[in-house]
Amino acid sequence: MKIAILGTSGSGKSTLAKRLGERYGLPVLHMDTVHFLPGWVERPFEEEETIIRRFLDENAGGWVIDGNYTKTCYARRLEEADKIIVLWFSPLVCLWRAVRRWQQNKGRVRESSAPGCEEKIDAEFVRWILHDGRTKQKWAQMERIGEKYPENYILIRNQRELEGFLKEL
């Protein structure tokens, strides 16, 4: 099984990826671990693309990948995915979760972050959560994915829907 998890920052993509990876015994790739170098420096695109392509090739039998990053093997990830899960929670819920995550991981690097990228929350990230990361264009992109892959597409808009989805596994 191949599962792509997309959605807004703070919606729980990495947590869900870890759970599904454990549930199905699949390797998990958190896109943030590839996109960033230590200190939240963006990795050169060619390197990032090579790492993702290698992961997909080496795990042809199944995987869980969380993260959007539409320039990095995006079409391939969606084409190959048996399930495309989109987490699109309210902005305030996502902000609350991001703040809680920061409080729990302050000064540490999360498993779903790149080495050397300590958990942080700053004005730029808050703006991303509340506005820039959830524009009408980004939502339209998620809707187009649902139209293109209706049999594989799962939209989850709140915690209750997420819990219902998890119970059905």
What is the predicted function of each stretch?
Residues I5:
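Hydrophobic anchor at the beta1->P-loop junction of P-loop NTPases
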Residues S9:
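The conserved Walker
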Residues T50-L95:
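Glycine-rich phosphate-binding loop used to anchor ATP phosphates in small-molecule kinases
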